[in-house]
Amino acid sequence: LGWPFKSPRYVGKPVPRVEDRRFVTGTGLFIDDLKLPGMLYAAIVRSRMAHARIRSIETGRAERMRGVVAVLTAKDVEQHAGFLATDGGEGVPRARPLASGKVRYYGEPVAMVIAEDRYVAYDAAELVEVEYERLEPVVDVEAALRDGAPLVHEELGTNVAFTHRRSGGDPEEAFGTADVVRKYRFRIQRLAAVPMETRGIVAEYEKGTGRLVVHTTHQFPHDLRRWTAEALGIPLSDVRVVVHDVGGAFGSKITHYPEDVLVPLAAKLLGRPVKWIESRSESLAVSTQGRGIVAEVEVAAKSSGRLLGARLKVLGDVGAYLFYATKLPFTNVLSMFPGVYRLKGMEGELIGVYTNKVPAGPYRGAGRPEASYLIERTVERLAREMGVDPAEFRAINFVRREEFPYRTVTGHTYDSGDYEAALRKALDLLGYSQMRGLKERARAEGKLVGIGLSTYVEVCNFASQSARVMVGEDGKVTVYTSTMPHGQGEQTAFAQLVADFFGIGIEDVRVFYGDTDLAPEGGGTAGSWTLTSGGAAILAACERVREKMLRVAAHLLEANPDDVVMEGGRFYVRGHEERAVGFREVAEAAHDEDALPEDVEPGLEAYAFHSPKLTYPFGAHAVVVEVDPETYQVRILKAVMVDDCGNVVNPLLVEGQLIGGAVQALGQALYEEVVYDSEGQLVTAALTDYLVPTAVEVPRFEIDRTVTPAPNPLGTKGVGEAATIGFTQAVINAVEDALWPLRLEGSPAKPSYLWEVTRNG
C-alpha cells in the first residue's frame, strides 16, 4: 500500500535531521532574532481581574514617559479593527483585540503601549491605570450551570456556549441487555502548552506598496493572513505572513489572538516596524489552554466482559470566548470515545461552558487524548471491578483485524488496524506476567506497585495541503510546502521523500515553508497530518515534474517517452540501460530552450494539491509505577510504548515525537495543572508553580512498533500526538492499580491529591 520507493536510500532510514545544524550552531532565525531598522516594541496592559466592568483607563503617565510613542485603548483600536476570528457561528459573542466595557478573564488585553525600547514599554505599561468594578467570577463549569450563576456574557442569559451530541447504534438495547452497569466520574485538568519559544510578532508596513508584512510564530500562516485582512478591513493581497523557525507550539499557536491584530495595526498606524514577544508569564496566562473537562461515563457490559454500550455527559471548560478552534477539541471527545472497542450503542452529550478563564484551544491531541482517557480509564476500572485481567478484557472487546474497514457507532470508519498485535507486543516488552508477580510480592512487603495499560486509536489527516516543486538547471530541487513545522523535522522527512523519488542526494533538496508569498495555500501543521497529507502533495508535484523530465530525457536519448525509465538519479531506455543521461543533464536541458522539443516549454516546476482521507493510527502503552506509601510520590519503574503509524519514513523522527509526547503525557498524569483561585486569578503563573517534567522525572521509554499501512499514497499515518493520546491514562491506571481499591476521579496524581484520596477512603 502506498510505497512508491523500490530501493530507497533515505526513506525508512534513521536520517539525522537536516535542520539541526542551524539550531545547534545558533544560526536559526526565530522571531525574537528579527531586528528591523526603526523598530518599536509593544507591551500589553492586561486585566488583573477575571470579571469586571472597566470604569476608566488613564494613560497620561504612560504617554508622558520618555521613549513612549503611543498608548492604544479600545476606543483607538475600534476605529481601525474589527473582531477576532471565531468558530462559534452566528450569534456567538466575539472578542475584540482590546476589551471594551468589560473584562472576562485574567490577562485579557485592555491597552497596548508602544515604545522605542522593550523595557520602556514594559515600564510604561505599569503606569497605565485601569479602574474596575468587580463582578462575581465563575471559574468552575458545574457552578457555571447552576441557577443564579454569574454570567460571562449577560446578553446570552446562560453560560452554555454550545451543546454537541453524538449517538449511534442502539444504546437502549445495549443497556437493556446488560448484566453489569457502572457509572464513573472523571475530571481532566486544564493544561498549558509551554512551548520552549513563546508567541511573538514583528509587523512592518511597507509604505511604498501599502502592504503589511507580519512575521509571526503561527502554525497556520495562510489562515492568519486571511484573519489579519478581515480584522483590519484591507485586501488580502495587502497582507504577507512570514513564519521563520519556531520553537514548539503544541496547538497554542493556532488561534487568532488579540496581539495578531494589535501589532500589525500599530505598525500600520505608526509607519514603523513593531515587535511584541510574549513573556513566559503571559504565555501561561493568555495562550490558549487545553483539556479541561468533567465527565460522567455510564457503561454497560455482559458478565463475560463483553462491552455493550456507553452513555456520556461531558462538560467542557471553553473559557470566556469561543476563539478559533476552541470547539474542536471538545467535539472530538464524543466522536472518538469508542476507541478500539466494538460498542453496540452509545449516546453522548457535551456542553461547552463559558467561564471567566482564558479561552480554551487545541493542545497536542485536541480532544482525542480526552476521549481515549475516558474510555481507557473506564475499561481498566471495569475490568478490575469484574475480576477480569485488564489485558484480556481489552482483547475480548477489540475491533478484530478482519473487521477493517470498521465503522464505529459514532460514524468514524477506521481504515486499518491490528489492535491485539500492538497490545501483545507491548505486554511482551513490559514482561507483563513477571510484572504482575512483582506487584504481588511488593504488596506483601507493604509497597504500592501498580500496572496500567492503555490501548488507543486516534483520527488525523484532517487538512488539505499543497506543494510546489522546482528543479533548477543545476539539478537541485526546491520544495515549497503549505505545511508549517515547529520542531517536527519536516524538512528532513520531505527531503527524504524527494531525494528517493528522484534518486538524488538529500543534500540536493531544499524545503521551504511559512511565507504566504511563496508557500502555496494549505492547512499548516497540526493534527498529525503533515507527512501524510503534505508528503502526498509533494510527491504528486514530483510526479508531474518527472513526467516532463521523461519527455526531455526521451528527446536527448532519441527515444519514445514511454520507453524511458527514471531510476537512481538517471534516465535510461528500457532494455538498454547503457543509453542513459543523468538527472542534472536532463535538468540543464529542461532550462535550455534550444535543447527542448518544440512542444515543451523551458523550466521544471509543478504544483499539486492533496485532499486527504482520514487515517487512524493506534497503539498500546504500558506502565509500572511505585507509589511511596508515606510521601505519595509516584515513580515510574517501567514504561513501554508500541505504536502503529503505518509506513515509517524516518524512525528517528518517529521516536522523537513519541518521547516528546510521552513526556507531556507524563506531565498531565503526575504534575501539570492550570489552577485558578475563586476570584479567577491565575495561581500557576510561573514555572515554579506550573510544574513540567524535567530530565529527573522522565523515565527511559522502551519503544517498538507494528506496521499496518494506511490506504493512502504513502501508506503513512500520523504520530505527532500518539503518545499524548495513549500514555497519560496508562500512568493514571497504574497509579489507581497501586492504590486499589481506591478510585482516582481526577488528575494529576500529585502527592497532595493521592494523600487526600487515601485519607477519604
Residue ranges and their predicted role:
Residues R146-L232, F398-K476, V683-T694, E702-D704:
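Helix-loop-helix junctions that connect adjacent transmembrane helices in secondary transporters/permeases
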Residues A81-T86, A124-L127, R225-W227, F250-H256, ...:
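Short acidic, glycine/serine/threonine-rich loops at helix termini
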Residues K13, E19-R22, G89, P93, ...:
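Glycine-rich loop/linker segments at domain edges
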Residues A42, L212-T216, K476-T481, I636-K638:
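Short, aliphatic-rich beta-strand segments
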Residues L236, A249-G271, K275-I277, E490-V498:
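Thiamine diphosphate
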Residues R64, A74-K75, G233-D238, K268-V274, ...:
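C-terminal catalytic domains of large/alpha subunits in multi-subunit enzymes
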Residues V18-R22, E126-V139, Q219, R226, ...:
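Extended active-site and interfacial segments that coordinate phosphate-rich ligands
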